[in-house]
Amino acid sequence: MTPPKTPAFQPLTGLYEPSAIQQLPDGRFLVVEDEKSHPLSLLTISADGRVDHTALTPGWLQLFSDFWALDDLEGLALDRAGFVYAVTSHSRDDDGDEKKSRERLVRFRIDGGRVMDSRVVDGLKSALAARHPVLAAAARIRDVKAGGGLNIEALEMSPDQNRLLIGFRSPLHDGRALVGSVENPSGIFESNEAP
């Protein structure tokens, strides 16, 4: 008897606008979405192709934490120590306004179905703008999509695990995407250093 074929493509029910996905050491997948009400989800894909989805939500003591005030998540990275890093777009909203919830870099762990050891860093946008005139000019653009305003799209840990690499959707430089780096990820989360 031939085993049933697992479809190559399946709908991911419960996910609406995924922006990034990161496989965790235990085989599950962490997905971030551009959804304020449920920005983080865990997916498990079983051997038979079944997909189980669990939205990560704050515990009672985390309800008012800045960590859960994340809007427009775009990138995920994982380090060897098991910390997950996530970044929001740092872009202005559709009205051209700046919002703290869109300008966050966070670090946390996943323990079972819970977020643990969460930390939030604000000030990445101002640090990038202070060091790079192209990014400073882009940060002033109110119409991000049409005008090439500052917009982070991706995050990755460097191969040596010492830096966080940030991929920008915009601005472009000579028609090419920019990649920036945070040189001190441990320091900003553990010692309150500036990015």
Report residues per predicted region:
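Sequence/structural signature of beta-propeller domains
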Residues: 1-195
